[in-house]
Amino acid sequence: PIRKGHDLYKLAYAKSFGIKPEAVSKDNRQIGKVQELALGYEGGVGAFLTFAAAYGIDLEAMGEQAIDTLPQPILNEANSALAWTKLNNRPTFGLSDRAWLVCDSFKRSWRYGHPAISSFWKDLEEAARLAVMRPGVTYECRMLKLRRDGAWLRIRLPSGRFLCYPSPQLDDAGKLSYMGVNQYSRKWSRLKTYGGKLAENVTQAASRDVLAGNMPAIEAAGYQIVLSVHDENITEAEDRDEFNADHLAGLMATTPTWAKGLPLAAAGFETRRYRKE
């Protein structure tokens, strides 16, 4: 059964600004969305800034609204972090002190509010380090298995599929890296990674496994899959009552055998041409 609850993005905003989820507007929900997307994979102020720019969020205005709602212990920690950042000439990304403090406080509140996820980042990074150092030994982290064989670090996903990282290394400081395509230069180069980034990799991969795993059943039911976009299936079907968005959503939200208990839901609409809802 699908577990019911508040909209995740509204809940994130409501917690940060001390209001009820029901009172969160559509525009303010975007701030909650930025919080979840930026902070869910060990991101900090820099990640918050990146996602805020993508979603058109004014961090200075947000800082003015939120500064008085922050718990004092959290704000004290953020003030200490800001002092350390300035002392060590670390970037503040052109933000005012108030905006920086609010972003950092949101980060801290999110991590305190999601201890299982925060510990997952650390545990996954430690398992990856150990696997790189000790080839041929399998390490487990939650539902994942990590092992290095030869020039490959592999993470076995709950579905049985593998994520593969070529030429994994640890530097003198114990930082992880592997070879891959640089997203900016598009050149083959050494890429740094960490617990939060690895968590993002496995989360996105598992999500893809859910989406792709239900595609055969969707096509068997008579829906022709034209393409998929992120978490969407775009299909064509005959213009008959039995083919409808609710039926397709039910097929997409079928829980795979390897993910028992995973709450899934889907929604959709019918249209003559592809568009965003």
Predicted stretch roles:
Residues 1-277:
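Conserved catalytic core of nucleotide polymerization and phosphodiester-bond processing enzymes
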